[in-house]
Amino acid sequence: MFTLKKSLLLLFFLGTISLSLCEQERGADEEENGGEVTEQEVKRNVLSSVANGINRALSFFG
């Protein structure tokens, strides 16, 4: 049970970091585009952040 709690805490922490990085990238994109971000860019950033978080979690446990 303790290892499950540690694993969930780690996944939450990695997810929080990924979302933070995604927001920073979005802010940089807004500055480049004059404040305009398309829906496609938002989806791409979110999906890449989720994929990075999953890869980090799998490499940690694998």
From Swiss-Prot:
Signal peptide bounds: 1-22
Entry keyword set: Amphibian defense peptide, Antibiotic, Antimicrobial, Cleavage on pair of basic residues, Immunity, Innate immunity, Secreted, Signal
UniProt GO cellular component terms: extracellular region
Broad class of where this protein is predominantly found: secreted
Localization terms from the record: Secreted
Superkingdom, natural source: Eukaryota
Signal found in the keyword field: yes
GO biological process, one term: innate immune response
Tissue and organ expression note: Expressed by the skin glands.
A Pfam family: FSAP_sig_propep
Maturation propeptide residues: 23-44
Any further remark recorded for this protein: Mainly adopts a combination conformation of random and beta-sheet.
Role description: Antimicrobial peptide with activity against Gram-positive bacteria. Has been tested against S.aureus (MIC=37.5 ug/mL), against B.pumilus (MIC=75.0 ug/mL), B.cereus (no activity detected). Does not show activity against Gram-negative bacteria (E.coli, B.dysenteriae, A.calcoaceticus, P.aeruginosa) and fungi (C.albicans). Does not show hemolytic activity against rabbit erythrocytes.
Family classification: Belongs to the frog skin active peptide (FSAP) family. Amolopin subfamily.
Record's protein name: Amolopin-P2
Lineage, opening ranks: Eukaryota, Metazoa, Chordata, Craniata, Vertebrata
